[in-house]
Amino acid sequence: MINKYTKIMSIILATLLLSGCTSSIGNDNDLEKDNGKIKIVASFYTMYDIANKIGGDKVSIKTMVPSGTEPHDWEPSSKDIKDLQKADLFLYNGAGMEPWAEKILSSIDNKKLVIVEASSGINLIENQAKDENLKNDPHVWLNPLLFEKQMEVVKDALVNIDPSNKEYYEKNFRENSAKVHKLDKEYKDSVSKFNKKDIVVSHAAFGYLCNAYGLNQIAIEGINADSEPSPGRMAEITKFVKDNNIKYIFFEELISPKVANTIAKETGAKTEVLNPIEGLKEEDVKNGKEYFTVMRDNLEVLKKALQD
């Protein structure tokens, strides 16, 4: 009896361990095994999060860009293209965020595939750095109200694909829309209390966030995450930090903090993470991190930086 019990417990534990090894943001999902669910391929984490929030248990999501990877310069593999051949919906941000998307979509032979560009219909911020190949800033989701618009685009697509579950998708959208407006109010109430409005960031990813709440981003590097600041730009930022009593230099987890650390060392400022939510680490997702929690983390570090 004891041996039988031990064997049963061993099987249960093994099952739990195996399930714990499965990617929680869909990098390892096998779309062929998800019978009855809408099969979604999401380009990177933020698109996964939107699809998950609206689709819930009615969808199976495969995320293309691996966990913790910077999506700007990632390139798809032949396996990713095969996944698109099996998918019902391909969700990508657009606006230049995934420069590889148009190239691979032209090679896909999947007549049922619905292609959804989440930034479609949104007024984009023009990229002021003329030496970069990006026409616009693609980081629209950092304005919560634009994130809501992206969720609505996905909701409408899922309703069209799967009208029998219309009420389910609309309910999920309403619930997350309420969370968006609560978050938006928290940002407005908090930021309005500070006279200081300038933030120094390593990467010009926060234009939509700043426009939404009256902030001004001073970017060391351009919208392209792999751009390099010139010595002149470094000197200009260093002077600005000193002249304006900037206490924090923001950097991103997926990009080297070397430049931010250099300026912080020269000016006496501190460094802190401001997350553009392009690609969360697997560990963070397993610990409950998602769009709303990370945006609140961002608000807390912004409040520290804006104090006089």
Write out the residue ranges for each language-model feature.
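Residue-level signal for mature regions of secreted extracellular proteins and peptides
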Residues: A14-T15
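Extracytoplasmic metal-acquisition and chelation regions
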Residues: Y5, S10, G20-D308
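N-terminal secretory signal peptides that target proteins for export/translocation
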Residues: M1-N3
